[in-house]
């Protein structure tokens, strides 16, 4: 057998089998849209559940006065103006429970507004 054949056969086989292995498909990342209503003196829904890794779009409205949408641990602090929608997007990277509060200080009832975001495994 010639040296060209000894070189050519392994080279051809290497390229032929290189395309046979397929990487497993990347896990599907979910994307969720959730409407949230802030009103005298409540946040609805009271609990929002999402899966770890999800791209979460919150569409927050208020039916009365200005509120603040604050989530400890997720670095979210957004004003929510009357009769407008505030869009908040975040990636749910870390499992756990996160408290949602109204960020308006000093107004009657604002400090009683609370909900929870739960990021599940």
Task: Go through each PLM region and give its residues.
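Beta-strand-rich interaction surfaces with strong enrichment in secreted/lumenal proteins
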Residues: 46-48, 75-79, 89
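N-terminal edge beta-strand
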Residues: 27-53
């Amino acid at each position: 057998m010639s040296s060209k054949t000894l070189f050519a056969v392994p080279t051809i086989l290497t390229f032929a089998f290189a395309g046979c292995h397929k990487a497993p498909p990347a896990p599907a990342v979910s994307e969720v849209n959730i409407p949230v209503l802030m009103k005298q003196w409540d946040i609805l829904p009271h609990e929002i559940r999402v899966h770890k890794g999800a791209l979460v779009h919150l569409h927050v409205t208020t039916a009365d006065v200005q509120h603040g949408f604050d989530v400890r641990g997720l670095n979210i602090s957004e004003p929510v103006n009357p009769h407008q929608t505030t869009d908040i997007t975040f990636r749910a990277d870390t499992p756990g429970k996160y408290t949602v509060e109204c960020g308006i200080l000093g107004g009657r009832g604002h400090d009683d507004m609370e909900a929870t975001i739960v990021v599940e495994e």
